[in-house]
């Protein structure tokens, strides 16, 4: 059985990080973009990371942050991986000594094979729905049929996923991992532990057939 990995993004509190880990999440994401309702300070993220059990990957999400901003954040909080959600180029993404994910906003005409070629140093491409003025956490899905079946690097599917549609997403797309933020929230920026559990159960149920 192939197991779909799960990332819960936009974690701001230790109780929600633990809820995700205890339910079986493989990774949690911290949003270090101040324009986001899910923004977390590096010190608050460090407090969350400190209570996580082993083997839960911590991912830091950045949007067009400066080199200094990212390095200052890395000094403040232990991160296992970076996620770039803006207009960052491959050399910049690879310059911090950590593996990274490259987010791709799926607007009309987006060529994921071209992105995979440009960002061959990325551990995965993370697809998200294109909404003007927003960088992730849109709560909207996109047409999954445009995703190529022969991507040379792993795919993380994101964009409008929730416990009701993630099973179908796993079945149709067969991504390496799924990523969720707004789909497990009680209100914008506030995670709901019950929704986190329901989401992870839905993924595991689909994996089990």
Model-derived regions: residue spans:
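Conserved N-terminal beta1-alpha1 strand-loop-helix module at the mouth
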Residues: 1-209
């Amino acid at each position: 059985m192939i197991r779909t990995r799960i990332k819960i993004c936009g974690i701001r509190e230790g109780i929600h990080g633990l809820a995700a880990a205890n339910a079986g999440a493989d990774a949690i994401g911290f949003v270090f973009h101040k324009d986001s309702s899910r923004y977390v300070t590096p010190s608050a993220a460090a407090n969350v990371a400190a209570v996580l059990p082993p083997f839960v990957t911590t991912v830091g999400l950045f949007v067009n942050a400066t080199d200094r901003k990212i390095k200052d954040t890395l000094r403040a909080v232990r991160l296992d991986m970076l996620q770039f959600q803006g207009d960052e180029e491959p050399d910049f993404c690879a310059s911090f000594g950590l593996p990274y994910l490259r987010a791709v906003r799926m607007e009309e005409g987006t060529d994921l094979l071209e992105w995979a070629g440009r960002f061959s140093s990325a551990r995965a491409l993370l697809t998200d729905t294109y909404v003007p003025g927003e960088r992730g956490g849109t709560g909207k899905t996109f047409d999954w049929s445009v995703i190529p079946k022969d991507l040379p690097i792993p795919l993380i599917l994101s964009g409008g996923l929730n416990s009701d549609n993630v099973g179908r997403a796993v079945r149709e797309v067969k991504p390496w991992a799924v990523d969720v933020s707004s789909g497990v929230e009680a209100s914008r920026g506030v995670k709901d532990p019950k929704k986190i559990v329901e989401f992870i159960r839905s993924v595991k149920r689909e994996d089990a057939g």
